[in-house]
Amino acid sequence: GGVRRSNERCFREVIGKLTTSLLYVNKDAFFDGNKIFLEDVNGCTICLSCGAASENTDPMVIIEVNKNGKTVTDKVDRERFWNVCRMLKLMSKHNIQQPDSLITEGGFLNLRGVNLANKNFQGEDLSEIDASNADFRETNLSNVNLVGANLCCANLHSVNLMGSNMTKANLTHADLTCANMSGVNLTAAILFGSDLTDTKLNGAKLDKIALTLAKSLTGADLTGSQHTPTPLPDYNDRTLFPHPIF
């Protein structure tokens, strides 16, 4: 028990120091060679740097842990590491509580089932998040990058999604009632079983989607929207999806 508590304290210390360091280093700078140093972590100094890709491997992040003149080195996948960094920055900036793992088994930012109601994510990069069953009620998601986001069964009632890019987003069984989706790019998004009752879709780009698979479009405003109906062949009434928890 004592060893476990010590490890947990060390882990929290690393996460805290890394989150603080990320205030001063962005993705481009880190990938271009800027290093991240975490000082005095249980008596160790940790150096994080981005290594170049080789012929047979993807780019990796090199982790060097130095203590008393001895250095231990390891490597992790670069994109997966940066997704952890993205998640830490989001959690810190928006006071998000995530007691589970930061990244899903598929490498997505893990926001599954998280309460995100009444938050302001305007202009954020939320691409490739897994927010299935998350609660976004009355949240500001305007001009947000939601490309490839998994919003399956999410509660998006009365959210502001104006101008957001939701290309290839999965909105299966999502509650989008009374949402403002004016000017949203929904190209190739999945709307199977989604509820678009009283949703504003004026000026939205609806190419390569099957609106007929939505649960309801009652009262939806489609004025000026661009719709090229190209249903995805692998989604039908027999496709298995998770069920909403709200």
Question: What is each PLM-predicted segment?
Answer:
Residues G1-T45:
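A surface-exposed partner-binding patch
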Residues A29, I36-L38, L48, I62-V65, ...:
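Short linear proline/tyrosine/threonine-rich motifs used for host-factor recruitment
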Residues N7, N26-K27, D77, A117, ...:
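N-terminal leader/targeting signatures
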Residues V14-T19, I46-L48, I63, F81-K89, ...:
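Extended low-polarity, hydrophobic cluster-rich segments
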Residues S49-A53:
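Short beta-strand micro-motifs enriched in acidic
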Residues W82-M87, M91-F246:
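Tandem repeat scaffolds
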Residues G16-K17, G33-N34, G43, N56-M60, ...:
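Intrinsic-disorder/low-complexity loop/linker signature
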